[in-house]
């Protein structure tokens, strides 16, 4: 992959997105930074232009608004210099399912899933045609564990993982790398925006450590990168168990335990 390939990063004004911008700029990539806060975007862009001598464009966009989303989609479809998409924009929310309003649930699903898949859909055909490029989707370990109690948020992140794994199977033979990154709790503003006190969390990872680890996985071309997972064999075992389960599914035959034995 050309080191000068432009990288488009959503949710780029702070946190994980901003650190991705810094790291890709350090690698010599030009950038397109997308977020709602134009003041923060411009400050980051100015800093990166000065420190790394790269071109940085900014797109102010709220990806839950269809007009803004279509603008970013058009940039991904039409700008042939963009070879890497970092689908980072996302949100969380506090409270149990019955405490969350219908509107807040719809907003969360729109940002965490609809925007992400539409942006991937906008760039993927062009990357396949080029036979090169990458899509990085930021998920969460919460998507593996309904036990964490964040049902809607976790469901959106389970979607991100499933989509990423499916796209990897579809697109990697055509030269396009797809990576799912699954952080655990990371020190970003997402917690405050969700109404969650970060100080109540027992453990939390620093953003720079998370992104640096994710980029190790990126360079290794891992389809799924889980920086907080200490034993890689655990993930391998989970995938092996999943494959074994699939082998037990008989599409034309009801399992014996559900048959009327009376």
Where are the regions a protein language model picked out?
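Conserved glycine-rich Rossmann-like NAD(P)H-binding loop of the short-chain dehydrogenase/reductase
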Residues: 27-44
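Active-site helix of classical SDR
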Residues: 120, 156
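Conserved NAD(P)H cofactor-binding loop of Rossmann-fold oxidoreductase domains
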Residues: 88-93
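Substrate-binding pocket helix/loop in short-chain dehydrogenase/reductase
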Residues: 96-98, 104-107
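Residue(s) in the substrate-gating loop at a strand-loop-helix junction
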Residues: 140
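Conserved glycine-rich cofactor-binding loop
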Residues: 11-15
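C-terminal helical subdomain
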Residues: 180, 196-235
């Amino acid at each position: 992959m050309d080191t000068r390939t432009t990288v488009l990063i959503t949710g780029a004004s702070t946190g994980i997105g901003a650190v991705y911008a810094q790291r890709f700029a350090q690698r010599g990539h030009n950038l397109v930074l997308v977020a709602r806060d134009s003041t923060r975007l411009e400050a980051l862009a100015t800093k990166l232009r000065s420190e790394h001598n790269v071109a940085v464009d900014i797109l102010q966009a709220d990806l839950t608004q269809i007009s803004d989303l279509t603008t970013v989609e058009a940039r991904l479809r039409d700008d042939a210099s963009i070879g890497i998409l970092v689908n980072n924009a996302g949100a969380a929310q506090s409270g149990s399912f019955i405490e969350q309003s219908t509107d807040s649930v719809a907003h969360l699903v729109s940002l965490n899933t609809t925007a992400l898949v539409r942006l991937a859909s906008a760039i993927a055909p062009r990357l396949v045609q080029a036979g090169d490029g990458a899509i990085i989707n930021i998920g969460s370990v919460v998507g593996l564990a309904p036990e964490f109690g964040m049902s809607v948020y976790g469901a959106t992140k389970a979607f991100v993982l499933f989509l990423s794994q499916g796209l990897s199977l579809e697109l990697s033979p055509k030269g396009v790398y797809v990576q799912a990154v699954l952080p655990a709790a990371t020190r970003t503003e997402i917690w405050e925006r969700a109404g969650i006190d970060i100080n109540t969390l027992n453990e939390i990872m620093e953003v720079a450590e998370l992104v640096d680890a994710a980029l190790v996985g990126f360079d290794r071309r891992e389809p799924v990168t889980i920086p907080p997972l200490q034993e890689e064999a655990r993930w391998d075992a989970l995938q092996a168990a999943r494959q074994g389960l699939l082998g037990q599914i008989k599409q034309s035959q009801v399992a014996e335990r559900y048959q009327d034995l009376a």
